[in-house]
Amino acid sequence: MGNTFDAAVVNRVVEGLAQSHQKLLLDLEALTDEMVRLPSLLEGWTVGHVLAHITQQGDSIRRIFLAAEQGQIIDQYEGGMSERVAAIEGAALRSAKEHVADVRRSIYDLEGAIASARQGWFGTARMVSGAIASVADLPLRRWREVEVHQGDLGLSELGCDGPESWSLNYVRHDLPGMTMQFKAHGPMGFNDLPSQVRTLGPAQRLGWLLGRVSIEGLPPAGLMG
């Protein structure tokens, strides 16, 4: 896989990610134990499950950065998907205070690994899906995870409820790329957005591409798995 390191793009993404990390921490200040046990917008997951995943996904990206700095290519999660699922289940029942503390720890651990990366930017990693990814692309993947899963919490009282809670900066950055990815899935590498999607606002349009917005009579975009 060719390296896709572009310093200017990476700088913008890392800055946006840091801002989204801080927004998440600020919004979670009012999290309660009762909220942790509520169902999230993801079927079968509580708010606690989503928070555990945000934490562990951050830890997995940190591991990749540290390994890449040593010239190593590792799996995103030790033990693969089964260990990832078990770890989320094991952490989901933590208290609100414990969740917030661990989210904060994972954020600063990851940001430290990103800040100290040198040659690691030119490495690759095996993602949990089995795909090989460039380390330089991981901050955007993490940014997407933070924004999308913050909306998946479904906590309107905290401002964490669906695509409309995603930051404008994130939507502006990721929408063009995800739109291009959708178009590339069509015959001859061209597949235009359906008319029902083109009439949506930017956040809702990106939400459809990422499987977070449903449109009656229209199948999912199919980009996320």
PLM segments and residue spans:
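Basic, Lys/Arg-rich alpha-helical nucleic-acid-recognition elements, primarily the DNA-binding modules
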Residues: M1-L42
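Structured surface interface patches that mediate subunit assembly and partner/cofactor docking
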Residues: M1-V13, L66-Q76, S116-G225
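Hydrophobic packing residues in well-ordered alpha-helices of helical domains and bundles
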Residues: V14-L17, A96-V103, P139
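Aromatic- and histidine-enriched alpha-helix N-cap/loop-to-helix transition segments
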Residues: Q19, L42-W45, H49-Q56, R141-R144
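Structural signal for well-ordered, non-membrane alpha-helices
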Residues: H21-L25, E29, G58-R62, R104-A115, ...
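Helix-loop segments that flank and shape redox-cofactor active sites
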Residues: L25-T46, S116-A131
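Conserved alpha-helical segments that form or flank metal/cofactor-binding pockets of metalloenzymes
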Residues: L51-G80
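A short, structured beta-strand-centered segment in the mid-to-C-terminal lobe
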Residues: E83-S106
